[in-house]
Structures are given as structure tokens and as C-alpha cells.
Design a protein with these regions (language model features):
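Loop-to-helix entry region at the N-terminal start of transmembrane alpha-helices
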Residues: 4, 8-9, 69-98
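Single conserved hydrophobic/aromatic residue that forms the stacking wall/gate
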Residues: 1-7, 11-12, 226-234
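Cytoplasmic-entry segments and transmembrane alpha-helices of multi-pass inner-membrane transporters
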Residues: 21-60, 101-102, 234
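Interhelical loop and adjacent transmembrane-helix boundary motif
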Residues: 159-210
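Transmembrane alpha-helix signature in integral membrane proteins
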Residues: 4, 8-28, 145, 215
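C-terminal transmembrane helix and the adjacent membrane-cytosol boundary/short C-terminal tail
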Residues: 104-108, 112, 119, 146, ...
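Transmembrane alpha-helices
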Residues: 102-103, 107-111, 119, 125-163
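Periplasmic/extracellular loop-to-transmembrane helix junction in inner-membrane transport proteins
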Residues: 4-16, 34-35, 186-199
Length: 234
């Protein structure tokens, strides 16, 4: 069980890289992009968010993992052909459109009167974004982050194809690892009786995953409701 949790934590840690990239792209689309670029980019981002994860899994196994091995050898590091780093990087790429689209919707929903008031006081556009828009949209942005992370926690195919199924107790992202979801798949593959220990372990792992994602989704929903109610109080 500990190995599964450690593997899940390593993959989540790598996915955090996607959060600033998604947020920066959302800020650009909401505040800087011309209307033509926004009208083109927004549907493309939403299409990217709908790509099947098995495609990302193939990309991780056939492109990213070998590149990481080559880079590791160049730096004198011992990198496995299947590593938590490869899976985490690709899952980070996978959730960038998700974070970007949700954060863009939240930033766009900030009342225009706040922007106008900031400009009237002499603030620049960048100062308005940092000191007015982002603080106002912060609950919704954090909610989008949590929803994206809970989406990534339940990912299976990328981890199976890029990080292996080996239950390895390590904090080294360059080694093989496994997550809760991949172990559920492994335990329930083939003919197993309901009272088989492997089946019971799979149910325990599934219950753990359910409560973790339930907590993240609930917290994200509460933050989103705070964001929605704040403009009405203003």
C-alpha cells in the first residue's frame, strides 16, 4: 500500500509543473490575446483536453521515456526505461489544457468594473492582473487546480505504459513506480474470486482513491462557489 501511495505522490509532484503553464496561458487568453487568436485557441484547447489518455500513454512510452533515458545518460545518471518522471511529465502536459480552460473561464468572469477601477487609479495592465484580477479569481483558480489534480490522480493508462507496474518504494523519479490506479488494474486482471485477497486489496485501494478525489472535488466546489458569490457581494 505504501509503495502505491509513494508512486502516486511522485506522479502528482511532477504534474504540478503543468499548473503555472496552464495559468499563464489562461492569463494570456483572457487578458492579452486578440479576439481572433482567442476564438481559435479556446476550441483547440478544449479539443486537446478530450484526447484519449491512451494516446498520451503511447507518446510517453515511445517518445518521452527514451528521451529521458538519453538525457540521463548524457548527465551520467542511471535512468530506467520506465520511470515515474516520464509518466509525470506527460500527465502534466495532459492537464495543461484542463487547467488553462477552467482558469480562463474564471478570469474572464471577473467583473469589468474591477479592471476599469484599477485603470482609473493609474495601474498598468500587469499591475491590474497581479493585484486585482488574480486575487479576485483566486478561489476559482485554486478550484481549477484541484479539479485538474483529481483528474490526474485517477489516470491509469499513462502510468501503466510509461512507469511500469512495479511496486517500488522509492522517492527517485528516475526509477519505475506504480500508482493506486495501476494496482487496481493489476489486481483485477484475469479470473479472480470476489473473496480473493487481491480483489479485496483492489477494493481497498479504490475506496482510498474515491475518498481522496471526493475531498479534492468537494474543496474545489466550495472554492468555486466562493468565487461565484463574491462578485454579487461587491
Amino acid at each position: 500500500m505504501i509503495q502505491r501511495l509513494v508512486g502516486s505522490e511522485m506522479c502528482i509532484r511532477d504534474r504540478i509543473v503543468a499548473i503555472p503553464l496552464g495559468l499563464m496561458s489562461a492569463i494570456y487568453l483572457a487578458e492579452y490575446a486578440p479576439k481572433k487568436i482567442r476564438d481559435f485557441s479556446k476550441p483547440v484547447i478544449e479539443i486537446l483536453a478530450g484526447i484519449p489518455t491512451v494516446v498520451y500513454g503511447f507518446f510517453a512510452a515511445l517518445v518521452v521515456a527514451p528521451k529521458i533515458v538519453v538525457l540521463g545518460k548524457t548527465l551520467g545518471l542511471d535512468v530506467s526505461s520506465e520511470s515515474a518522471l516520464a509518466a509525470g511529465v506527460v500527465m502534466g502536459v495532459m492537464i495543461i489544457p484542463f487547467v488553462s480552460s477552467l482558469s480562463d473561464d474564471v478570469i474572464t468572469a471577473v467583473p469589468q468594473s474591477l479592471r476599469d477601477g484599477s485603470f482609473a487609479l493609474g495601474a498598468t495592465k500587469s499591475e491590474t492582473i497581479i493585484k486585482v484580477i488574480l486575487p479576485s479569481a483566486l478561489p476559482g483558480i485554486i478550484g481549477s487546480f484541484l479539479l485538474a489534480i483529481s483528474r490526474a490522480i485517477g489516470e491509469t493508462m499513462i502510468v501503466v505504459m510509461a512507469a511500469s507496474l512495479q511496486a517500488n518504494l522509492t522517492i527517485n523519479p528516475l526509477e519505475p513506480a506504480t500508482t493506486i490506479t495501476t494496482q487496481i488494474v493489476t489486481a483485477l486482471t484475469g479470473d479472480t474470486e470476489f473473496d480473493n485477497p487481491k480483489t479485496l486489496v483492489a477494493f481497498a485501494l479504490g475506496l482510498t482513491l474515491f475518498f481522496v478525489t471526493l475531498f479534492l472535488n468537494y474543496f474545489a466546489l466550495k472554492l468555486s462557489l466562493i468565487h461565484i458569490s463574491e462578485p454579487t457581494r461587491r
